[in-house]
């Protein structure tokens, strides 16, 4: 493996499709390894735009615009960091030999919506999941619930991110509202939802799974320690590592994650979401990229999920070792405003073993994730207390 010099004829060029806070960290990790990075997003001054060598603003669901940009920039690798991408065009780009898609164009296409990956996991691989059906109309949704899914259940757009459009239904009175909310929350392909039966789980985890080359050049699967997390409305608000699990549950979680990521193939880090009850484990979702709950790895592992993704992408060896217990807590914008400021940083960073990441998003919304606090501790409980305390000290303000 050779890496050249950025901004020179020898440069290794990587294009990130999606330049949010997770993409920003991947860009920084790639640049530390001498890679020339092109960041692409749908709006100007996205977090990753602020640190990349070059930045572009396009609609990534526009296949023609995407191909034109790839032909212009000539990246060696394309790294999708979001779901809303013209994945059919990625398949064409890869088939034409214009660039290698990470982990593969097929993986990007399958995981761009919940239908593709759920059918792969449950119907092709036979992995345990919640009971589910897909619906294209309010009537189909009601029929799916009445036909066996039952209440309580969860309705999600087949394509959305960060919990957008997701609802918990406790009875018939919730169906219309959930359908309307899902239609407004989906990124594309609006009007199709997945309805899932509720699993009585003890906790949910993200198992960061890395497919990387070893010193012999073979792709090997590695696992990080499990990450526990709390979600509100489908959106992560805090995470911690490690999450205590029984040996049997951990082994089953790793088996499920290996089966899914092995089928998707390629190189890179995958965020595999799982439900756990005792020794039983159910597959929920997978993202072929760093996961928001994995922000905790900025303080808990020797190499963060972003550094692991960068190394795996480049065909380099990885080390998934846990360094010490850590936790993360989200900092919300709290207001509808452009160009907000943040106060209370002195108090936040006075919390023992704490650190902050302010993402630099150009516009704040009340529940938009604008930053994260991370902290270490003697235990995950202590780390969680510190991370939440540090996050609570940060006060978004109008300038």
From Swiss-Prot:
It catalyses: N(1)-(5-phospho-beta-D-ribosyl)glycinamide + formate + ATP = N(2)-formyl-N(1)-(5-phospho-beta-D-ribosyl)glycinamide + ADP + phosphate + H(+). Its EC number is 6.3.1.21. ATP binds at residues 114, 156, 161-166, 196-199, 204. One of its GO terms (molecular function) is phosphoribosylglycinamide formyltransferase 2 activity. GO terms for biological process: 'de novo' IMP biosynthetic process. Mg(2+) binds at residues 273, 285. N(1)-(5-phospho-beta-D-ribosyl)glycinamide binds at residues 21-22, 81, 292, 361, 368-369. GO terms for cellular component: cytosol. SUPFAM superfamilies: Glutathione synthetase ATP-binding domain-like, PreATP-grasp domain, Rudiment single hybrid motif. Keywords: ATP-binding, Ligase, Magnesium, Metal-binding, Nucleotide-binding, Purine biosynthesis. Pathway: Purine metabolism; IMP biosynthesis via de novo pathway; N(2)-formyl-N(1)-(5-phospho-D-ribosyl)glycinamide from N(1)-(5-phospho-D-ribosyl)glycinamide (formate route): step 1/1. Residues 119-314 form the ATP-grasp domain. Involved in the de novo purine biosynthesis. Catalyzes the transfer of formate to 5-phospho-ribosyl-glycinamide (GAR), producing 5-phospho-ribosyl-N-formylglycinamide (FGAR). Formate is provided by PurU via hydrolysis of 10-formyl-tetrahydrofolate. Belongs to the PurK/PurT family. Homodimer. This is Formate-dependent phosphoribosylglycinamide formyltransferase. It comes from Dechloromonas aromatica (strain RCB). The gene is purT.
